[in-house]
């Protein structure tokens, strides 16, 4: 065998081993991969998932962020099923070796509701990062483990280690949301709502999206004070309403930690998040202005405009912010439930001054604006 033939044979063998690795990973949807078998000499040569056992190892990448992703998965489940599960403990997770990764998390969650059938369950949650340096995540799997009726996996979308759109269905979301661009799709949705197969606010969301909507594309700018006073467009939450939900503060923490990952690198950093104080929250949805506020809170498509303070030194790409914990800051978060039940969050910090990119090679004696002590550039 010539050198070229040996090289081709080795490449083909590596390809087959790589393909077989992901075939084995697919059997558990990427969650239980500890027993995947590789041929001798192939360990370290296969690009696959890295496994972290959080019960045995206290040091793992981005501990704060991973737990927020786990909470986000439970939030998706609660939003669809009407439950109140909370994170009890992160047991293990698998992730890709990429800047933007997919996280396959196994966790314990408990439902504080006394009427709940079981106080604690094991959950599996998959979260895919869709952007780096800002909030852009998608959750397509959030389900109790070992519950057959909830482990139905759609065959419409094959297992893909990392994706930027579309969801691998997990059977939690019963029925599909039509795209609502055609009359037939809209009529089908209206029929599903009339039969109580889907909540009414889903129809409101769809009608708004059909009319053009605002829950696509780039995030909006922060609205003016006059616009926020428009009660038909915005609903200003009462303090008791946003305090009664733990997920609004989770949205804010996700915006901050995905923008500045240094906060998530050590277990000591959560003190930054503990100082956050929400001042007010406005919601923009597709639901009617006369709908009860709790319906707006459950809307599958919504913008959340969060005013807060307590973050001394915000960091965001190519932005400069005023420094000080006393400064009131702004964050926008978009929540969208996809037509297969995947939940997406996009978010950003507002209020910073954008700066232009400059050459790294400064002229002799020229001082970089990044060195000024009064401001901090993300």
UniProtKB/Swiss-Prot annotation:
Protein name stated in the entry: UPF0725 protein At1g23970
Family in the record: Belongs to the UPF0725 (EMB2204) family.
Pfam assignment, any one: protein_MS5
NCBIfam families reported for this sequence: A_thl_para_3677
Domain of life: Eukaryota
Sequence intervals crossing the membrane: none
């Amino acid at each position: 065998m010539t050198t070229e033939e040996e090289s081709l044979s080795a490449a083909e063998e590596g390809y087959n081993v790589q393909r077989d690795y992901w075939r084995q990973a697919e059997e558990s949807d990427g969650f239980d991969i500890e027993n995947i078998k590789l041929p001798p000499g192939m360990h370290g040569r296969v690009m696959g998932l890295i496994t972290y056992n959080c019960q045995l190892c206290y040091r793992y990448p981005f501990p704060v962020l991973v737990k927020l992703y786990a909470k986000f998965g439970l939030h998706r489940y609660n939003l669809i099923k009407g439950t109140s599960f909370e994170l009890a403990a992160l047991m293990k997770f698998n992730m890709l070796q990429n800047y933007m990764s997919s996280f396959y998390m196994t966790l314990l969650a408990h439902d504080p509701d006394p009427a709940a059938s079981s106080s604690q369950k094991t959950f599996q949650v998959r979260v895919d990062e869709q952007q780096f340096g800002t909030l852009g995540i998608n959750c397509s799997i959030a389900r109790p483990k070992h519950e057959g009726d909830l482990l139905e996996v759609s065959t419409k979308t094959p297992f893909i280690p990392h994706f930027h759109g579309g969801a691998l269905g997990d059977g939690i979301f019963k029925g599909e949301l039509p795209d609502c661009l055609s009359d037939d799709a809209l009529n089908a949705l209206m029929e599903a709502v009339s039969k109580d197969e889907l909540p009414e606010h889903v129809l409101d969301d769809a009608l708004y999206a059909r009319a053009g909507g605002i829950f696509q594309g780039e995030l909006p700018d922060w609205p003016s004070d006059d616009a926020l006073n428009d009660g038909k467009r915005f609903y200003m939450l009462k303090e008791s309403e946003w305090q009664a939900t733990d997920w609004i503060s989770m949205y804010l923490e996700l915006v901050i930690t995905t923008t500045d990952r240094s906060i998530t690198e050590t277990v000591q950093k959560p003190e930054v998040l503990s100082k956050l104080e929400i001042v007010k929250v406005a919601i923009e949805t597709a639901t009617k202005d006369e709908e009860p506020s709790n319906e707006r809170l459950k809307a599958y498509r919504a913008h959340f405009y969060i005013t807060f303070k307590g973050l001394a030194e915000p960091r965001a790409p190519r932005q400069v912010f005023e420094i000080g914990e006393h400064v009131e800051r702004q964050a926008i978060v978009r929540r969208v439930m996809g037509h297969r039940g995947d939940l997406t969050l996009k978010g950003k910090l507002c209020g910073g001054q954008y700066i232009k990119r400059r050459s790294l090679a400064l002229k002799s004696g020229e001082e970089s604006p990044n060195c000024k002590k009064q401001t901090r550039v993300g």
